[in-house]
């Protein structure tokens, strides 16, 4: 995600968009815990966890945009409504509103035994751009597709033992499937969940899920190789504190890129340096927001 926002070329952008946002919804479903609380209580819990960071960091960037480009109501209207269109700087916060509605919908459908509705809702999300004249507010189109991915993630977790071969593929098989997956992704059109673009829908689902399962196996191989190292602990912290990275990465990249432009860093290495410096700063921010009283800003 951070590399995508730094920008490493059109091909890289196309490849990661095929799976990186689907992966966030899948992972959220994989980590989902069954709750006995009522829907109202759940809404309150999820609003604190997801909507407080959404409005804090989205609002902060709207204020900053007003300071830089002049006061305008458009960023605020989009923050409160069409949040996939234009939220300045930290546009990625759309995911928080999408995940909020995905989690509420999933819990409601499972609570009232309407799980079968997940499939038509996910299909509607894939077709929303073609069926509707305007994007749905609050990233609801992406939320509908995310509901299907969330379900797959949770079902994968429940069936982890029976899916052990799929979730623990050997390195050689992973590399072969990576080549196949890359070819399929490049064969398909451009994918962007935020913009409700899915090109060939069956191929979108195949590519997204294949990428995710390859990623799970590779992550286990990498973790085993890096066991008990600082890098392993750092990577775990990125996943644990991912909301900080979602909310802050574009803001950090914005200032780091502006600084590099000011000092005249060579173009050949600029993107790599921006990525490295941004990740260091983001790690510092994750420590700040998770270990101090500022944790309320990220819904803790």
Label every PLM stretch briefly.
Residues 1-300:
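Alpha-helical transmembrane segments and their immediate juxtamembrane cytosolic regions
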């Amino acid at each position: 995600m951070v590399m995508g926002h730094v920008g490493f070329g059109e091909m890289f952008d196309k490849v990661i968009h095929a799976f990186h946002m689907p992966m966030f919804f899948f992972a959220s479903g994989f980590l989902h815990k069954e709750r006995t609380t009522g829907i109202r209580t759940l809404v309150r819990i999820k609003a604190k966890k997801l909507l407080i960071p959404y409005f804090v960091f989205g609002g902060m960037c709207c204020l900053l945009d007003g300071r830089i480009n002049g006061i305008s109501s458009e960023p605020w209207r989009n923050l409160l409504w069409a949040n996939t269109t234009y939220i300045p700087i930290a546009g990625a916060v759309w995911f928080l509103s999408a995940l909020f509605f995905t989690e509420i919908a999933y819990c409601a459908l499972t609570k009232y035994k309407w799980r079968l509705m997940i499939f038509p809702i996910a299909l509607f999300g894939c077709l929303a751009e073609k069926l509707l004249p305007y994007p749905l507010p609050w990233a609801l189109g992406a939320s509908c597709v995310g509901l299907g991915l969330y379900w797959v993630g949770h079902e994968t977790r429940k069936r982890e033992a029976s899916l052990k071969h799929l979730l623990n593929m050997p390195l050689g098989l992973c590399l072969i499937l990576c080549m196949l997956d890359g070819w399929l992704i490049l064969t398909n059109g451009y994918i962007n969940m935020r913009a409700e673009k899915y090109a060939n829908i069956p191929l979108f689902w195949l590519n997204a899920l294949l990428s995710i399962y390859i990623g799970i196996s590779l992550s286990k191989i990498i973790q085993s190789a890096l066991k008990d190292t600082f890098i392993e602990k750092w990577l775990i912290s990125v996943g644990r504190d991912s909301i900080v990275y979602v909310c802050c990465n574009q803001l950090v990249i914005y200032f780091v890129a502006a600084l590099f432009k000011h000092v005249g860093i060579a173009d050949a290495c600029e993107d790599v340096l921006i990525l490295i410096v941004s990740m260091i700063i983001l790690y510092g921010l994750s420590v700040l927001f998770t270990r101090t009283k500022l944790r309320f800003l990220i819904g803790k």
